[in-house]
């Protein structure tokens, strides 16, 4: 059996409990894995500031793939140092947003950079803190997107009446050129630069470290985890994962509320 050298795990719905916290057991399992030579990488749709807060809560000092692969952080010294970004060209962003507006009139947007968040006022009005781990009043507002004063890594789109899963399916079926569409289970659809995913960022990290696909295990529960689940040598899903994602699992773990990822890491101990 090939030895696992790296575990990449999604956060919400996978590593985190339903209250969006990391259990003491999971924090200890990640640290024990690090000490035994198994690298743990976080792979999430979340932004830099939110990942930093989570890392501080549990003492995580590894690497984190953020914004569905568009941003990579190194938290080795406790600060969220950006080591890589993949941006969306402004022309591609404008064309993609126009396409989605045509497909679903009434859709509203926000543009996200490595550190910035710019939203249409109607987008901010639909948000709760948990949606982006920032209060709506903390968002920079702009009536005319795309509009951001740093390179754009992600576009988010939502509709006041159409569920995000339905909006995602409609956009995928119709096709939106120049961007990579995905859905994390949040109340919005996410777009990155074409070809960017958690898998693309993970593959680059592994190439630098000389880690083969077969030496990688990945845990995830949602559509945005599918690329890395199909890329890795071992696909893991918590039992609460979406049915279509569970179908990809080599191993089904206990649920996120039962510390499923921790149980897998504990099983890797020599």
Predicted region positions:
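Residue-level signal for inorganic ion chemistry
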Residues: 33, 44, 68, 155, ...
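Mg2+-dependent phosphoryl-transfer enzymes with acidic/Ser/Thr/Gly-rich catalytic loops
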Residues: 2-6, 17, 22-23, 190-270
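Active-site metal-binding loops of divalent metal-dependent hydrolases
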Residues: 11, 69, 220-222
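N-terminal glycine-/serine-/threonine-rich phosphate-binding loop
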Residues: 1-40
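Conserved acidic, metal-coordinating active-site core of Asp-based
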Residues: 103-219, 223-227
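Active-site phosphate-binding/coordination module
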Residues: 24-126
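Short active-site oxyanion
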Residues: 35-41, 60-62, 154, 214-215, ...
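Short, structured coil segments at secondary-structure junctions
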Residues: 58-60, 67-68, 174-177, 231-232, ...
